[in-house]
Structures are given as C-alpha cells and as structure tokens.
C-alpha cells in the first residue's frame, strides 16, 4: 500500500495544504496548516506530511502509520 502524501507550503501570505494536486485548505500560519495536514494524515494512514520551506525544499517530513515502504 502506498503512502498518502500531504504537502504544506507557503503561497503569498497563506499556507496551503495539498493532497493529490488539490488545495485542501488555505490558512494564515504554518502552525495551522501543519495541524490540518496532521489531522488528515492521521485519518488517512499510511501517510506522510512534507513541509516545504520558502525555497520549495523539503524542511520536514512526518509519517503516520506503517506501510510496506517502511
């Protein structure tokens, strides 16, 4: 089974939560966006959150559940 990947990234002044190339939420802070992504990822295991920094590089990765790739 593949991991479901949720992305957290900045866009202008907002922070976006994305999954399957769809914006799920636009939030005022990184903290809020990570919380929303974490809730969705916990409910959609196995999953991961990739948090992008201002340059677009992955700054942090969080995983939820166990999958065949572990």
PLM region spans:
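A short amphipathic beta-strand at an alpha->beta junction
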Residues: 46-53
């Amino acid at each position: 089974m593949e991991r479901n990947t949720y992305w957290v990234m900045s866009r202008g002044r907002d922070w976006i939560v994305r999954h399957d190339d769809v914006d799920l939420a636009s939030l005022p802070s990184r903290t809020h966006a990570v919380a929303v992504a974490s809730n969705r990822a916990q409910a959609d295991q196995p999953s991961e959150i990739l948090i992008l920094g201002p340059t677009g590089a992955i700054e942090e990765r969080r995983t939820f559940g166990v999958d065949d790739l572990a």
